[in-house]
Every structure is written in C-alpha cells, then in structure tokens.
Amino acid sequence: GRHGQAQPIATRQCHSGFLPSNFQGVEFRSTGDPVLYVNSPAGVTPSRQRDVVDATQALNQLYHDDSDDPEVLTRIRQYEMAFRMQTSVPKLMDLSGETKATLDLYGSKGGDGSFASNCLLARRLAERGVRFIQLYHRGWDHHGGIKRNIELTAREVDRGAAALVKDLKQRGLLDDTLVVWGGEFGRTPMAQGSGRDHHIKGFSMWLAGGGVKPGLSYGATDEFGYNAAENIVEVHDLHATILYLLGVDHEKLTYPFQGRQFRLTDVSGKVVKDILA
C-alpha cells in the first residue's frame, strides 16, 4: 500500500548552501506541472520571448558591469536557463515514447509522484546531459511504527532504484553516471519504543557506476551494529571520493565563505581508493 508516496520536500534541502548562488538547483515537483511558470503567456511566441530575454539580459549585464555584483550573473544565467527550459521541459516530461517494458521495470506509469516515477525522470534527465540530479524519499524517519513502515518504504524505493541502475546500464549511461544512494545518517541498532533514533556512528550507503567497483562491500561495524569499526569512511572521505570520480581535486576546489576559503571537504577527507574500479 502507498504511504505518502508523493515526495514534497522543503526547498531548503535543495539549496546551494555556502556555494555561489549560480549553483542553485532547479526544483522539479513530483506531481502536476514539474516546473512552475515555465510556459509563456498566451500570445507570446518563442521569438518574442527570446527578444524579451535578450533585452533583459542586456540591462542586467550593464548593471553587473557597473556594480560587479555576482548575484546579477546568477540572474543572467537563470533567465537563460528558464528560456531553454520552456522547450526542453515539456519534451522531458512526455513519457509517450517509453515502452511498456521500461514502465514495468520501474513499476510506475510515470507522473504519479512516486519515487519510481522520479527514478524514471532521473534517467531521462541523465540522457539529456543534466550533470547533477538529486532524488528524495522522505519516508525514512522511523521514530515510531518501524516494523510496518520500513517494509512499506523499502517497497516504494527498491524497485525504482534498481530499475534506474539497470536502465542506465542497458542504455550505456552507467559508466559515465555515478549513482549515490544513502542519507545523512543511519538508525540506532536497538529499539527505542516502536522505532529507532538518528545514529551517525555507523551506517551504510551504496554507489554504482561512474568508476566504482561493482559487487564490493567495504567497511564493517562492531558486532552490535553501533560503531563503524573496519575501513571507516567519514562523510568528508565520501565527498572527496565523489569529487575525485567527477575529476575534481577536493583539496584545490575552494569557495569564499565567512572570511576564508572553504573546501567542500572542509579541512579533512581522503579519497577511498579501495572502492575505485
């Protein structure tokens, strides 16, 4: 049964953080219009819209030349991206060309707000060259009712996630696409009432494609499942490894924040080379 399959998530979860605002992602809604206000008003042709965007961009560029405000550059890029999305988003969301076999693989007819539908959308985004795609399933915070809810949540996630990896592979996209599946923490190994609490001392994630070894289990917890005890990977190690697979040296990539240059791995992090293909 469904239990909150639609995946609304707070916009702050998709924020660029301390990175420059031009790295801000575009939020796709799970149901209804995927991106709001992407359609031109009635009577406005694409060529007229192009003229409006060009005129606005010219004014924005003049303002930037005078003010040197980086936020203006962000606005310029956003206007241009919004114009491109007016033609690309409708094509992206048109699933009429997907075969029954593909829809059955994901277990979704598409556009129903389910995690499986979002996985299918992720594959279509990857095909079109979108470089970073983030999917959420918000149903994992099992402080209560875990025996029932963990089964329902896993059922909603497993098929779509597996289908995404299989589909990327059969289309020749997996070697160039890194799939990272996980959350920001795990759950306690002992029951707390009818659920489990947040736990950062030991938890698992999986990676597929994009330069990592397949079929490898790396690291282990103690016998209680409480503390990571073997081949411990810190979060900054994970981030350093992801950046390495993207061709980025995590020790050299920095951004100004709060008066100093920050790395995405702060002052730590090492590439976990044992998991690299």
Where are each of the predicted segments found?
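Ligand-binding pockets and gating/stacking loops
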Residues: 1-277
